[in-house]
């Protein structure tokens, strides 16, 4: 009680999978989760895996690397940095898609985000995925086949997990 710790966070679409369970936490074991549990937590860090919108245990429509997703990542960094158990220092780590979200977060200049460790992440996601405020054709074609599958699982929430721009954007952008 009264102890504060720095936070390491990983943001991405991959966290609706079989989990590793320890006595006090449940974390997806593949990706970086198991390594963080084994190598980082024993040194006094908190660890958060945050599902981007429309994936895992999150809600809202999946806004693949779009403005809403970026604002959500920034809001989550602020939330992590202001918890009573947090010392106010949040770092982000990730590879692949999760390596792009640290770059997204860094663009906001969030006072709680102290460092990023992007591994194989995209820089300039907005330029790649969006054109004139709408998703470009390659956004859903290139990435929804992979990333969209994390938000679409055949249940009634699927319609809510698809942003309207993904339906009309490629045809108009």
Predicted regions and their residues:
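Signature tryptophan residues that serve as conserved aromatic anchors
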Residues: 79, 85, 143-145
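Beta-sheet entry/capping signal
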Residues: 7-8, 46-47, 88-91, 112-117
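Cap/lid segment of the alpha/beta-hydrolase catalytic domain
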Residues: 2-81
